[in-house]
């Protein structure tokens, strides 16, 4: 059965006639209730992210609008207008709000939305800037990594890694652990560098390059690596999920599966969306063996999966949020939060039963999941 599933996803997922699967009836065992919704700006939100705490949410719109909201009620605390188009963000924290504008400037604002500094980034940025250990990290589309001083905005170091002539733009987020930065790169590489200096530590081949032409050989790691004790997991676009030893870079196990999305991990099982939008649960203790697969949402351009209580939650291109049982993969809940508007790539679990997200028109939504 697993072989048949892999054939369906791996070999038929590349067809040009990938029509989104129609919504199917299901046995409702969980409900999704909208707590509040708030619109940011007058323009779309591209695929912008947001930052949040227990008390507040900060989100942006591509027209330069920034908005701080109460987490409990959605009430607007303040609004700011930036005289540039916002392309990437929001990142950072509530003391240092980060985003990238269309003309390649990285901005840093304080908790009231006032500018602290901005610097020019020499290259395209496609991932949200992050703060770790009082430093700012920016990932460029050509896979370069920048460390920037949080107080002054000065560049401390730059890590440059060679990329193939033909590669996807670098969109994977970085993972930080024990003074090491892990990131996916072109040609199916997972790379580790020292956080303090940007010095290279090791690289591992997550996916084997196959084929003759550059297109045939195209394989990148576009998902955020996941840490599990002495292992790090990464998945490639061309068909491999791999567990790597963090000390030696040795391959512990690998299995065939492809994904462009970030993966979720609960300490035992790995949850990921195949590039066909089938959703898998894989046993990390058994070399990635399939626990279950759900193909009900194929080609619906789903978001990164998140774990919320005893469910997996994903959004899709039609504004739906779906709940799948964590143990079985069966759909148990669904709600159309944004009518005919795609949910942004990232939705976020808040505690065990709430979800925060933003759609591509800049509507921020806060929902509660209840078992029925």
Task: Outline where the language-model segments fall.
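WD40 beta-propeller blade core
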Residues: 67, 107, 146, 191, ...
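Structural signature of WD-repeat beta-propellers
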Residues: 61-62, 101-102, 140-141, 185-186, ...
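Loop/turn-rich, solvent-exposed surfaces of beta-rich toroidal or solenoidal domains
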Residues: 272-280, 289-323
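Beta-propeller domains
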Residues: 61-72
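Extracytoplasmic beta-rich repeat domains
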Residues: 3-8, 14, 18, 27-51, ...
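Short loop/turn segments that connect beta-strands within beta-propeller blades
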Residues: 70-73, 110-114, 149-153, 194-198, ...
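C-terminal closing repeat unit and adjoining cap/tail of repeat-based domains
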Residues: 316-362, 368-372
